């Protein structure tokens, strides 16, 4: 079903997404090994890895091994930048050895709605006096800032927005 699009678009579309084991979130080696194994299942696999400290290390290693990673469970600009830098290091290491990166499709997914959820809880817990309407835009602000920096630095991974909570999220990202 997806393979024709994958072939036609040279790996940029037509990918099948699969998640590494969430229980490995603190185990860089385990995440990387899981991702590398999943990539052997089909040429169009996009492997999801968590943006934890261990996950970022695994993302670099898996990227180096030619795995198209979707860094997921990302909630902040600093996490998105750590992902971009890890992916760039993996791509550079791979390229330096003459290995192809042409069909790789590295992605970082920022969970905009979940970021909003966390900011609302934190604002309430810390008694921050803020217009409630602004709390629905934290994730979008995070996404837009990360996007600006990705463009400014020339980072190759694409940014995706996920976990929308309201219509404004979709309209603001598009």
Q: What do the PLM-derived regions correspond to, one by one?
A:
Residues 68-174:
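Catalytic alpha/beta core domains of metabolic enzymes, predominantly
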Residues 1-59, 64:
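Active-site beta->alpha loop and helix N-cap motifs at the rims of alpha/beta catalytic domains
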């Amino acid at each position: 079903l997806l393979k024709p699009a994958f072939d036609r678009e040279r790996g940029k579309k037509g990918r099948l997404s699969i998640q590494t084991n969430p229980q490995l979130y603190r185990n860089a080696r385990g995440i990387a090994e899981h991702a590398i194994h999943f990539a052997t299942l089909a040429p169009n696999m996009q492997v999801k890895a968590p943006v934890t400290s261990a996950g970022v290390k695994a993302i670099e290693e898996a990227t180096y091994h030619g795995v198209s990673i979707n860094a997921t469970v990302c909630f902040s600009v600093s996490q998105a930048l750590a992902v971009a830098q890890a992916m760039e290091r993996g791509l550079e290491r791979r390229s330096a050895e003459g290995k192809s990166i042409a069909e790789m499709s590295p992605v970082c997914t920022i969970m905009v709605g979940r970021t909003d959820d966390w900011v609302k809880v934190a604002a309430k817990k810390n008694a921050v006096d803020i217009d409630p309407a602004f709390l629905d835009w934290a994730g979008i602000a995070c996404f837009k800032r990360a996007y600006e920096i990705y463009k400014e630095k020339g980072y190759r991974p694409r940014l995706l927005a996920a976990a929308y909570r309201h219509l404004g999220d979709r309209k603001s990202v598009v």
